[in-house]
C-alpha cells in the first residue's frame, strides 16, 4: 500500500477515505486479467459456450494451456488420486493430422480448424479402487471418468475467463489417437477439447427448469 499518496493535513475521516480508495484500487489491480477484469462466477458459467468456429487470427499459447491445466488440477478427485492426463497439440501439422484422421465424425475436423486440441484421459483402475485393484463400489472406473469431468469443467471455465472458447468432443477415433500421441494402454481416452478464439457468437441454449431436476426431502 502506498501511504505516500495520502495528503497531509486532512481530517481523520478524509484520511480513512483515502486509505480505503487505495486498498480498493490495489484489490482491483490484483484481479485484472489480460482481457480485463475477472468475471463473477455466475456470469462466467453463463457465458461459456460450445463453439464450432474458431478465428485463424489468434493462436493459443503454451502458457495459456498451462493455465487451463493448472486450473483443472484444482478439481477434487477420489482420494486425491488426480488420475486425469492431458495431451495438447499446438503444432499446426500435428493438429491437421489429428483432425483429419481422428476427428472426422460429425464434421468435428472442420469445426475445430484454427483451434488447439487437448486429448483428455484418465489412468484407469485407480480412482474408485483399492490398492489391491478391488473396486470400492459398483461404479468402478466410472469414478475416473467422473473425476476427469470435474477437471475438464475447471479447464473450460478457465478458458472462458481468459477470453477463449472450447468444444468438448466425444466422437473421435480413440485407437488412432492413442497411436499418434503414444498414449499408454493404462489410460482411458475420453474426450478431445478444442480451445481457441471464437469466430461466432452462439446463443445461450435453454436450460431445464429447477423443478425438473431438483427434489427436496
Report each predicted region and the residues it spans.
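Cationic, amphipathic, low-complexity segments that mediate targeting or membrane/lipid association
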Residues: 7-8, 14-20
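Short, Lys/Arg-enriched N-terminal segments with co-localized hydrophobic residues
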Residues: 19-38
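A glycine-rich helix N-cap at a beta->alpha junction
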Residues: 108-114, 183-204
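Small-aliphatic-rich amphipathic alpha-helix that forms the alpha element of a beta-alpha
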Residues: 72-73, 118, 136-180
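Glycine/small-residue-rich phosphate/adenosyl-binding loop
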Residues: 64, 77-148
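C-terminal helix-cap and adjacent tail motif
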Residues: 43-51, 56-59, 131, 191-217
Amino acid at each position: 500500500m502506498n501511504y505516500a499518496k495520502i495528503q497531509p493535513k486532512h481530517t481523520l475521516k478524509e484520511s480513512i477515505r483515502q486509505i480505503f480508495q487505495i486498498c480498493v484500487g490495489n484489490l482491483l489491480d490484483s484481479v485484472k486479467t489480460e482481457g480485463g477484469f475477472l468475471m463473477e462466477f455466475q456470469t462466467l458459467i453463463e457465458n461459456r459456450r460450445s463453439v464450432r468456429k474458431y478465428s485463424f487470427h489468434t493462436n493459443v499459447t503454451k502458457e495459456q494451456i498451462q493455465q487451463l491445466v493448472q486450473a483443472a488440477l484444482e478439481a477434487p478427485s477420489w482420494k486425491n488420486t488426480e488420475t486425469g492426463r492431458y495431451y495438447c497439440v499446438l503444432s499446426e501439422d500435428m493438429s491437421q493430422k489429428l483432425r483429419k484422421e481422428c476427428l472426422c465424425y460429425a464434421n468435428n475436423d472442420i469445426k475445430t480448424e484454427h483451434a488447439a486440441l487437448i486429448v483428455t484421459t484418465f489412468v484407469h483402475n485407480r480412482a474408485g479402487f483399492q490398492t489391491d485393484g478391488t473396486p470400492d463400489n459398483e461404479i468402478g472406473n466410472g469414478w475416473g471418468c467422473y473425476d476427469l469431468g470435474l477437471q475438464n469443467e475447471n479447464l473450460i471455465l478457465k478458458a472462458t475467463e481468459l477470453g477463449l472458447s472450447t468444444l468438448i468432443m466425444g466422437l473421435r477415433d480413440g485407437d488412432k489417437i492413442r497411436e499418434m500421441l503414444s498414449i499408454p494402454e493404462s489410460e482411458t481416452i475420453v474426450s478431445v477439447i478444442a480451445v481457441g478464439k471464437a469466430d461466432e457468437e452462439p446463443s445461450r441454449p435453454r436450460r431445464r427448469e429447477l423443478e425438473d431436476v431438483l427434489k427436496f426431502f
